Amino acid sequence: MARPDDEVGPAVAPGHPLGKGYLPVPKGAPDGEARLVPQNGPEALNGGPVLDPLVAGAQDGPQALIAAEEETQARLLPAGDGEDVPCPACPPRTALSPRRFVVLLIFSLYSLVNAFQWIQYSSISNVFEDFYEVSPLHINWLSMVYMVAYVPLIFPATWLLDTRGLRLTALLGSGLNCLGAWVKCGSVQRHLFWVTMLGQILCSVAQVFILGLPSPVASVWFGPKEVSTACATAVLGNQLGTAVGFLLPPVLVPALGTQNNTGLLAHTQNNTDLLAHNINTMFYGTAFISTFLFFLTVIAFKEKPPLPPSQAQAILRDSPPEEYSYKSSIWNLCRNIPFVLLLVSYGIMTGAFYSISTLLNQIILTYYVGEEVNAGRIGLTLVVAGMVGSILCGLWLDYTKTYKQTTLIVYVLSFIGMLIFTFTLNLGYIVALFFTGGILGFFMTGYLPLGFEFAVEITYPESEGMSSGLLNTAAQILGIFFTLAQGKITTDYNSPEAGNIFLCAWMFVGIILTALIKSDLRRHNINTGLTNIDVKAVPVDSRVDPKPKAMVSIQSESSL
């Protein structure tokens, strides 16, 4: 639309220097004094530049226009189809890539298979004890090796993620998961327990490159209004694998004793061959699926979208690589008190979940002998309910951004759910455990993505992979401790309730720590334009001023 005459000033004759995009510069004026001044008024909306007063004064009246031909001329960049003028005040361009859903799906699927391989032994622990002729502790170590491997390997894995990127990390996770599945296929003989352990070790190394990726995948590929839901969906893939790990193994590899009408298990060669055949079917099926997903990762999993999906990601992309310090990032996180509190509370909750998942079959069979299939179904119920909880919590966070309140409420409800599950174990009605297990799973498993997203918020602009990796490290360490301690308490006292109460005491400590966390929604403030912070890693107590460059207001959650 053409602007009114009263906005453009005197008419300029065709061929006049002003009409060709030149500005008059008064004699004696220093170089660079003819310039454009940013404008927020009608001229700016209509594309008209506003001149510095020095230049504007040269245009007053026809006399100035005629004299302007004798002055030095300054060439302006065209305002039309020419080269864009850089605008430091303008926000970076962002866009959402349709490929983000493909990347999220691929990651969720190979994470699913990895979680399935973690729990497939524990869900039918009595079957593998008979087949390999080993103790329950040996079978428990097939689960705990995931936790042991994670602790020393998380730091090199996080360094690899931060320096080599998302794609290489994804390829290593998917590839090692595939390799471990094939190694297990060669372990289906009674004397080859060490081979199945080797395959499980490879899968546990793959897990190091998987567990810390939900937050980076969500942040790099998804916009601010969907990042929490995307993170919850990525975590959901791992949870779904655990659910399938509880459901399928009891069906694919049933305990032979349950097929004998006399109730006696005859260790004949035929029974051993049948058991080996069933285990073979499960292992080869897992290997073929893992191989397919690995090739899919190679083909379709890309490093990042062409354009950043959010202002927070755009700022991180513009940060020079040499400004990022891996050691400074770790040091900053370790000195960030709110993050340390979250680190311990997340480790308690997730470690308790790992312990319950590992020992669930033994807990159920203590009171309900021969109910391996139903024990697996209870585990399935626990995890599926948690998947629903994860998605709902992710949607809630995207809508409200109430990270601390939501995390604390879910923590308290998980504690209550654990108490209910504990004191309904010996009622004599296994149906009741489906209900109480579902309550426990809804809140306990639903907490996992909350911890990831809360950590990213209070540690931005530190690497999402670093914060997620440290959270998972705490979870693995406490998971090992809880599994060994709960297993010993349960065995020594022949009482699953005693082991569960042990976990309840620790979860109560986690509630207190969560309540003490000071919430500072740093990433959310960037995405909403409330603040523009320096992305350099600066120690939290450094003498260097770490305050935002520009600040309108900072959003924090109220303390409870």
Swiss-Prot record:
Entry's transmembrane regions: 93-117, 136-163, 166-185, 193-221, 227-252, 271-300, 337-367, 372-400, 403-425, 429-458, 467-492, 496-518
Keywords noted in UniProt: Cell membrane, Erythrocyte maturation, Glycoprotein, Membrane, Phosphoprotein, Receptor, Transmembrane, Transmembrane helix, Transport
Family recorded in the similarity comment: Belongs to the major facilitator superfamily. Feline leukemia virus subgroup C receptor (TC 2.A.1.28.1) family.
GO CC field: mitochondrion; plasma membrane
One GO BP annotation of this record: phospholipid biosynthetic process
Residues binding choline, per UniProt: 476
Purpose: Uniporter that mediates the transport of extracellular choline and ethanolamine into cells, thereby playing a key role in phospholipid biosynthesis. Choline and ethanolamine are the precursors of phosphatidylcholine and phosphatidylethanolamine, respectively, the two most abundant phospholipids. Transport is not coupled with proton transport and is exclusively driven by the choline (or ethanolamine) gradient across the plasma membrane. Also acts as a heme b transporter that mediates heme efflux from the cytoplasm to the extracellular compartment.
Entry's localization field: Cell membrane
Any Pfam family matching the protein: MFS_1
Location, primary (coarse class): membrane
Cytoplasmic-side positions: 1-92, 164-165, 222-226, 301-336, 401-402, 459-466, 519-560
Encoding gene per record: Flvcr1
Reaction catalysis annotation: choline(out) = choline(in); ethanolamine(in) = ethanolamine(out); heme b(in) = heme b(out)
Annotated stretches, region: Disordered: 1-43
Record topological domains on the Extracellular side: 118-135, 186-192, 253-270, 368-371, 426-428, 493-495
Entry GO MF terms: choline transmembrane transporter activity; ethanolamine transmembrane transporter activity; heme binding; heme transmembrane transporter activity
Residues the record marks as carrying a glycan: 270
Protein name: Choline/ethanolamine transporter FLVCR1
